């Protein structure tokens, strides 16, 4: 290793000065002479010149043993910078960050004294800065969210009534029965899409693992019964799950083709394609001893006759159906095509809707059936009331044409006389709740192939309608005698001489 100390003591080492070196001057004149253009343009071309501060920054120059030392003047602004505290530096940092385009709310240092404690958003799990937080309105809840996350992911916009998803059922928005310990899901068992797959924690009442976490479904289940067949063993093994949950783009919702009921012309009253018959036998005859409501003992009601002007009851009596229909809606069923559901609760014997369509004769009905057969149509909406009086709702009608058949129906069809006109109404056979399908017994005679019944009732007959019964012919032959199988012995008397 090179020894610099020995080199300095060696006599062979000669120190030479720069040819442009000038004699040392005293005071500020030295700085002027060194920084003069003549000296800077010397033979050294400034390569060997030291870094000399400007003249206005030189405070004092000391020369000792040919070595010149400069003392720099102290700037008053430097004294202020040396007196900076941490808050001043933080403010300066915030100012520079805001100038660069960063939001001032994000310029937040949680380690400072008195700073708010930062929490993570329960949706995106990123820090929530002051001014961007949306806190839960439930007392004692520490949940915090970004305003944007709560609006886009949870659908909340009002900060005053905001609640965490775990405080209410995601379906009925009422107080929850259980909360999931792994996600913000909360619900009741009856509102859960897979209630059997919810794992309720025994040691934590009100806590559970919801259906979103299939890997934990079998934590609390009992072992299955031992099987000897390899096929049964593989059937009981849980399937591997790669995706636990996925989201569907809302744009796909518009691309789904909405299925509508079969097209038909909606009408409010029957359209007669035959001569309209009017029964005038009951004109001028009505109830006389009924009260204002006309209960079941009403003479007109027993005969399925609507009260009219000839009755002594007022216009507001209860035996005037076909005036106000119940609220119903057309829905798509799982096994029976289109059907009708009750949109409100219906009491027993209440009028629901009138069965209307085109009134045709028997000849027209037969012709239409042949035409439908040639066209391949399988759905018929014909209701035969009496001779030459068939209501066909195939092309024109109302929602009653979609009522399905059931072997255990909750509705009945009744034929009434209203102001001398024959009309058919659908009445409730029992109490019907809202959302319950409306059905009645078709009672039709099947002449062609059998049609399977999908009503699902306990007393389902299996097939729609009944076949036409052929009479059993009893063949009687009066000429032939029946052969006896047993002979009774006859006692003979002895002959007398």
Curated annotation (Swiss-Prot):
Residue intervals of the SET domain: 326-443
Domain AWS: 283-326
Chain ranges of zinc fingers (PHD-type): 118-186
GO-annotated cellular components: chromatin; nucleus
Protein name in the entry: Histone-lysine N-methyltransferase ASHR3
Organism: Arabidopsis thaliana (Mouse-ear cress)
Locations listed in the record: Nucleus; Chromosome
EC number: 2.1.1.-
Gene giving rise to this polypeptide: ASHR3
GO MF annotation: an example: zinc ion binding
Family named by the database record: Belongs to the class V-like SAM-binding methyltransferase superfamily. Histone-lysine methyltransferase family. SET2 subfamily.
InterPro entries: ASHR3-like_SET, AWS_dom, Hist-Lys_N-MeTrfase_SET2_plant, Post-SET_dom, SET2_Histone-Lys_MeTrsfase, SET_dom, SET_dom_sf, Znf_PHD
């Amino acid at each position: 290793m090179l020894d610099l100390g020995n080199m300095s003591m060696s006599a062979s080492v000669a120190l030479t000065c720069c040819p442009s070196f000038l004699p040392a001057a005293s005071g500020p004149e030295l700085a002027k002479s060194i920084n003069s253009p003549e000296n800077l343009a010397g033979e050294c071309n400034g390569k060997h010149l030291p870094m000399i501060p400007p003249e206005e920054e030189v405070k004092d120059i000391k020369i000792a043993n040919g070595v010149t030392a400069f003392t720099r003047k102290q700037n008053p602004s430097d004294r202020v910078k040396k007196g900076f505290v941490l808050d001043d530096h933080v403010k300066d940092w915030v100012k520079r960050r805001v100038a660069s385009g960063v939001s001032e709310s994000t310029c937040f240092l949680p380690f400072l004294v008195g700073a708010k404690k930062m929490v993570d958003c329960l949706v995106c799990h990123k820090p929530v800065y002051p001014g961007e937080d949306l806190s839960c309105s439930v007392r004692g809840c520490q949940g915090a969210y970004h305003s944007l996350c709560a609006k886009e992911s949870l659908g909340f916009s009002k900060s005053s009534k905001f609640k965490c998803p775990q405080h209410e059922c995601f379906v009925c928005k009422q107080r929850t029965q259980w909360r999931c310990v792994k996600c913000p899901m909360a619900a009741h068992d009856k509102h859960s899409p897979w209630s059997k797959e919810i794992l309720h924690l025994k040691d934590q009442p009100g806590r559970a693992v919801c259906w979103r976490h299939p890997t934990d479904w079998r934590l609390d289940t009992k072992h299955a019964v031992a099987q000897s067949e390899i096929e049964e063993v593989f059937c009981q093994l849980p399937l591997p799950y790669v995706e636990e949950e996925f989201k569907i783009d809302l744009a796909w919702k518009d691309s789904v083709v909405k299925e509508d009921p079969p097209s038909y012309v909606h009408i409010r009253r029957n359209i007669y394609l035959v001569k309209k018959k009017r029964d005038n036998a009951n004109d001028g005859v009505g109830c006389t001893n009924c009260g204002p409501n006309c209960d079941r003992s009403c003479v007109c009601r027993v005969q399925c006759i609507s009260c009219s002007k000839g009755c002594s009851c007022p216009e507001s009596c209860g035996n005037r159906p076909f005036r106000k229909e119940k609220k119903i809606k057309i829905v798509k069923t799982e096994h029976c095509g289109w059907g009708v559901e009750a949109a409100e609760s219906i009491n027993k014997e209440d009028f629901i809707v009138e069965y209307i369509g085109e009134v045709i004769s028997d000849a027209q009905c037969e012709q239409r059936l042949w035409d439908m057969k040639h066209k391949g149509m399988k759905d018929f909406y014909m209701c035969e009331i009496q001779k030459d009086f068939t209501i066909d709702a195939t092309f024109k009608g109302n929602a009653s044409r979609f009522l399905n058949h059931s072997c255990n129906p909750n509705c009945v069809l009744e034929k009434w006389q209203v102001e001398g006109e024959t009309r058919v109404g659908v009445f409730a056979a029992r109490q019907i709740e809202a959302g319950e399908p409306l059905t009645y017994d078709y009672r039709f005679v099947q002449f062609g192939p059998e049609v399977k019944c999908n009503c699902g009732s306990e007393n389902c007959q299996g097939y729609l309608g009944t076949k036409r019964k052929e009479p059993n012919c009893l063949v009687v032959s009066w000429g032939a005698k029946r052969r006896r199988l047993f002979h009774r012995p006859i006692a003979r008397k002895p002959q007398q001489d």
